[in-house]
Amino acid sequence: MASQGTKRSYEQMETGGERQNATEIRASVGRMVGGIGRFYIQMCTELKLSDYEGRLIQNSITIERMVLSAFDERRNKYLEEHPSAGKDPKKTGGPIYRRRDGKWVRELILYDKEEIRRIWRQANNGEDATAGLTHLMIWHSNLNDATYQRTRALVRTGMDPRMCSLMQGSTLPRRSGAAGAAVKGVGTMVMELIRMIKRGINDRNFWRGENGRRTRIAYERMCNILKGKFQTAAQRAMMDQVRESRNPGNAEIEDLIFLARSALILRGSVAHKSCLPACVYGLAVASGYDFEREGYSLVGIDPFRLLQNSQVFSLIRPNENPAHKSQLVWMACHSAAFEDLRVSSFIRGTRVVPRGQLSTRGVQIASNENMETMDSSTLELRSRYWAIRTRSGGNTNQQRASAGQISVQPTFSVQRNLPFERATIMAAFTGNTEGRTSDMRTEIIRMMENARPEDVSFQGRGVFELSDEKATNPIVPSFDMSNEGSYFFGDNAEEYDN
């Protein structure tokens, strides 16, 4: 799976479907983001937002959440059947921020879900355009990945907080489909499976009857998705064991945690896509850009180019640093929360700092925060270079294990070494190599021990000037080998709580 990423052109990596050629893929991705842009413009008209207000990222997020909520079939059905006080199952809304007399004011709006669905379909040639909805989900997921830590969720499932770099996409909804599955990290899949197994342990009927059969199918499908992310035969064989287990229990949980740890060095292939806020696509469409005709790719130069000429604003709390807020959103836009900071800094052209050093909280503003003191500033989302997004995980020498780092899942296909603290990782593998998976475990540990931190990943791959749209002249950066580049170092971010 990893090798495909390098053999196919980056346009083809987008839709996972090998059946379309590059031009068709670029057109269909273009149609998708164009639809998002048209929807956003229409919503701004409905809400009578000024140009400035329409470029406010908080307004964009509210509008995105409204359409996602309007199309959330399962939740809508649940709300119909379990009416709760003060929640109208047919309506959706959120905070919209407007500029009044030199101040920002919050206005809570409410819309019929039916109306939102109508506007969305109208913007998407009458179709449901599920791909566009998933795209918005991935943007929200990437923003969460950059903003929050998942320590508590990791600990609850018996995993180690140091495995945070495996948690990409951990807040994606279940209904995010194949595109969502592609961007989920190994840790995210492991966590979903462990939760499922734990329910089975606690609830006798979980695997039984008609429902149990559906549950079992879902379990096996998730196992296969995770198996597809691993790149070594031993890891895949262990996944087969977990999938085929008659009655999944603690042994399977152990195996899964073992596999998650192994992924710190024997990295899984996880896709990265630059998904931008709806307002960015809206701005481009409003200025007359025809996405479908021009074609678009989420893994090439296009998102970089779009961000070079888009001005997006954000509300800023009194003691926040606007540059730090910009970094947070830049990382979210490029799905770079788990990338090596050396690589991100080089591409962005300004230093990208670890989260522990950021003076900024999340992008969204809570309903009880005081608007009186809110200011707004321009987000600096431009970059110095662009680079192709990867889905390989960066293991060197074709499929063999290579150095991983306790905290990186590469986003950009750019040559670098992946420094890591082997002692820290290997310490987690003492003891238990008996049981049905013993030979696979031994093999995995052997591969990990043979991994060398000085090996170079993405050999010969470089970044490109923004004028080099055909990616003809790679500039291969040289990095300080010793400097470990984890975003989560000295972390003090808030937990992600629904």
Swiss-Prot record:
Pfam families: Flu_NP
Primary subcellular site in the record, as a coarse category: virion
Record PTM: Late in virus-infected cells, may be cleaved from a 56-kDa protein to a 53-kDa protein by a cellular caspase. This cleavage might be a marker for the onset of apoptosis in infected cells or have a specific function in virus host interaction.
InterPro entries tied to this protein: Flu_NP
GO biological process: symbiont entry into host cell; viral penetration into host nucleus
Residue ranges of the motif Unconventional nuclear localization signal: 1-18
Annotated GO MF terms: RNA binding; structural molecule activity
Protein name in UniProt: Nucleoprotein
Organism: Influenza A virus (strain A/Duck/Memphis/928/1974 H3N8)
